[in-house]
Amino acid sequence: MQLFQNILVSIALLTQVVFAIEITENKVDRGTVTLNLSDITIYPGASWSIIDNAYTSFVGKLDVRDGAGLYISSTSHLLALQVSLTALLHSITNNGVVSFDSRISRTSSSYDLRGVSFTNNGEMYFAASGEFSSSTALTSASWTNTRLLSFYQNQRTSGTVSLGMPLGSITNNGQVCLNNQVYEQTTQIKGSGCFTANGDSTIYISNVLLAVSPKQNFYLTDKGSSMIVQAVSTTQTFNVYGFGEGNKIGLTIPLMGNLWNSAYAYDTTSGILTLRNLLLEQKFNIGTGYDPSKFQVVTDSGSGIPSTILGSVAYYGRVPERTLPKSCQIPCKPIPEAPGTTPTQYTTTITKTNTAGNTVTESGVVNVSTDKGGSWFTTTSMFPALSTAPSTATVFSSDTIMSTVEPDTTELASLTDIPIETSSVEELLSVMSNWEPSSAPTLSIETPVSSHHSSMQHSSFESSADINTVFSSESAFETASDYIVSTPSSISHSTMVPQSSVSALSVVSESLASAEPSFVVPSESFIFSASSAAPQPSSSTYSVSFTTQFETPSSAGPSLVTSVESNTELISSATQSSDIQTEFTSTWTTTNSDGSVVTESGIISQSGTSLTTLTTFQPATSLVVPPYSVIETEFTSTWTTTNSDSSVATESGVVSQSDTLLTTVTTFPPAPSAIVPEFTSPWKINTSIESSETLTVSASSYETVGESLAAATSSYLSSATVVVAPSESEINTSSSILNNEEIASAPVSDTTSIAEHHDGSLSMTTTEFVNSNSLPSSHSIVTATITSCNKSKCSESVVTYVSSVSCATITVGDSEKNSSIVGNNISSIVGDDVSNTQAITMATSTESATTLTSVSGAKPSVANDATNSVHTTDYTTATTGVQNGSSLSIPSDIPIEISDITPTDSSSSAVTISYENGSNKESIENIKYLTLVVFGLMMFM
C-alpha cells in the first residue's frame, strides 16, 4: 500500500513537471486555449493574455509573480467568461496583476476559484456586464488579502460575491472594492482591512453569528450604497464610514421600538447609532457630528438582499469629517486593459531552408484584427523576393525637359527605417561611426525616379537633412538577389544608378522643393542614403556624385565611395571590403603656418594600427547660383477708375505682371445689358387752383410715345396717377402741395418699381412715404375698354388703369374737418359731368431739365361728410383709393396744376399720367328720379 502511494506521488510530481507552463515573456492567445494538467507560473516582467476563451479551467496551481500579469478577457458580446480553478489541492498566489474582464459580454459570467489556499498580495479584478446575474466566489479554505480585490459590474443584479469557505474565516488586511455589486458575508471576517461600497453596492452581513472583527471597516462612498445586517440576539458593533447623503444602514427586519427605546437612537457623544426591532438590535459606529433630526427610517429594496420595509435608516445631510483608516485609503482602481484586446500590427521574420539547402530569411507583416462579429483573425503578408524592374528617370533643367532615359535598376525593399535628423556634417559622421551593424539584412532604400528644378521658389528658410542609413555585414548577405525593387512616386530630386554603371554621374539642383537622392549598387554591404526633408532656399546647391573604385588585388570585391556636397561641407563614406585593410572617411584639423586652424576631410586607410591618408577632399568652391528667371504672367482683373467729373467707374481686362510691375494689356468693353439700370429721379410738384373748366396737358417738351396718347382733354378732373413707363425699372417721386405759396399738405414721397412678365403684362410696386410712414402697394397696369353713359349718351374709350392689390388710403379734407378713408374706401366725388379716363405716355428728354406746364382743370369738388356740401376754395388732395380685391383704381383728387417737373438724372425716362373722372351728385339724383318714376308707374298700374 505504501508502495502504491509512493508511485502515485511520483506520477503526480512527474505530471506537474511535464505539463508545467512557465511564462517568461509577453504572450497573447486568442480563441480556445487548453491548459491541461498544468501548473502555471508567470515570471516578473512577463504577461499572459488569453482573449475570447469561453471556458478557462485551471487544474494546477496558479502563481503570478511580482511584476507579472495574467489577463483573461472577452471582446465578444455573445461570449461571457467562465473561469474556474477546481484543483482543491492546489493554491492561488498573486503578487502581480490578475484581471478577469467580461464587461462587454451580454450574457452571464462566472468566476469560481477554489483551492487549498488563496493569497493576494497584488491586484485582482473581477468584472462582468451585469446585464444578467453573475456570480463570483473565492472559496479557498485559507483566505488572505493584503492589497486590492476589485469586484465590478456595469449595473447591479441579483448576483453576489462570496469570499472564503462558508462557515470558515477570511483575513482581510487590504481593500475589497465593490462597484454595483453585493457582498454577502458567509464567514468570519478577521483583520483590519476595509470593504468599500461604490455606486449601487451593498455590504450584506448575513450571519452575525460569525463574528466580524471590531477592527474591520466598512466604507459607504455614494448615496446609492448601503449596509444591511442580520438581526439576531447577538449584538455586534460595526465601524461604518461615509454614512450620509442619503445612503442607508439597516437590519433584515423592520425597525420597531419597545416600551423603553425607540426604533433607532444616536448617541452624539460616542457616535454610536443603534437600530432595533423590539428586543433585537445592532450597533454601528458612524462617528460624531450628526444631527439627530436628519435621520429617517426608509426601505432598502436593492437587488440581491432581503427587501425589508422600513428596515433601514438614512441620514439626509452631509457626512461629518472623519479620518479614514489606512486600509480604506487604498484606491479602488479601474479595470486594467488586457494586452492584445485591440487590433494590432507587427513585423515578423522567418528563417527557413529552401530546396537547394540554402537558409532563406523572409520577413512580413502580421495583422491581428476582428471581424464584424467580434471574432479575431490573423493575416500575415510576407515580403516577396528580389526582382528587377525597369524605372524611368527624367531629368529636368530649369523649365525645360532635357532628356529621358530608361535604365534597369536593382533596389531593395524597405523593411526597416533608421531615420536620423541632423543639420551638420559632424552629427552625421558621429552617427555613422557609432552605429553597430545588425546581423539581420534589414534594409531601407527609397527609389528615386527623377530630378526636377523649379524656378518659382522665392522663399528662404532653414533646412535639415533627413538621413536614412542602413548597414549590413557581408556575412548576412552577399548579393541583393533576395529583395524586391521598391519604386516610390512623386520624388522631386533623385539620381538613378544603372546596375552595370562604372562611370561617374553628377546632378546639380537648386531650390529643391523635396529632394530625396538615394542610390543602390548590388553586391555591396554598405549602403548610404541621404535626403533633404525640408524644402531648401534658392541659394543652396546640392551636388551628388557617385564613383565606383577598385581596391588592390587583395580586396574581395569593389568598394563604393559616395560623397555629398552642400555648400562648403562634404560628407564621404567608404566600405570595408577586406578583413586586412580598412578604409574610412575621417575629418581632422590642421594648423597653418599663419596659426589658422583648417578642417580637412579625406579617406583614411587603416591596416592594423597604421593609418594612411589616401585622399584629401578639396574644399568645395563657391557655388554661383544663377538668378531666378522673371516669369511674366497674365490674368484677368477688375479695377475702379475715377473720371474727370469725380465719378467712379468699374473696368475689367487682362493684366500682365512681371515681378512687381503690372501692365494693362486689354480692357474689356462694357457688356450690353438687357436690363435698364435703376435710378432715382426726384420731382417737385407745385399745384394751384385754376378756374378753367377744362384740363389741358401739353406734351410739347416730351417725346410722344403713343399717337393716341399724346394729348387729352377732360372736364372736371378728379384724379391723376403718375406711373413709370415700362422702359424704367424704378423711379422715386416726391411732392409738396402749395396753396397760396404756403405748404398745404405733408410731403409725399413715392418709390415705384415696374416689372415686365413673360406674358407681356406689366406690374408696378409703389411705396409711399407720408411723414416718414411707409405705405407699400403693388399695382398692375391694365388696358381696358370702358363704356361711359350719361343719361342717353354713351361713349367708349380705351383706358389704361393702375390697379392696386392692397393699399391704405388717406384723404386730407378741408381746414374745418379732415376726412379719413380707412379700409380702401373713399368718399364719392361730386361733379357736373362724367367723362372718360385716358392715359398720356411721355418720355422725358435726355437733355437738361424740362418742365411740364399749363396743366389746368376744373375746380375739384369733394363731398364733406358733415355738411354734404362742395368745397372749391380749399385745397384737397387724396391718394388713390382701391376697394379690397378690386383690380381697377377708384378716382381721387390731385393738384390741378402740375409744374416744374424736373428730373435730376439725365437718363431717359417716361411717365404715364392717367386721370379719371368720378361719378357726380347729379348722376345720383338722376337715378333717384328714375326710381321714383318707375315706382309711380307701378303704383298707377
Swiss-Prot record:
Record-linked InterPro entries: Cell_wall_rpt, Hyphal-reg_cell_wall_N
Membrane-protein topology: Lipid-anchor; GPI-anchor
Main location: secreted
A GO CC annotation given for this chain: side of membrane
Physiological role: GPI-anchored cell wall protein involved in cell wall organization, hyphal growth, as well as in host-fungal interaction and virulence.
Protein name as it appears in the record: Cell wall protein IFF3
Glycosylation (residues): 36, 367, 686, 732, 790, 818, 825, 884, 917
Entry similarity comment: Belongs to the HYR1/IFF family.
Post-translational modification: The GPI-anchor is attached to the protein in the endoplasmic reticulum and serves to target the protein to the cell surface. There, the glucosamine-inositol phospholipid moiety is cleaved off and the GPI-modified mannoprotein is covalently attached via its lipidless GPI glycan remnant to the 1,6-beta-glucan of the outer cell wall layer.
Removed propeptide positions: 918-941
Lipidation (GPI-anchor amidated asparagine): 917
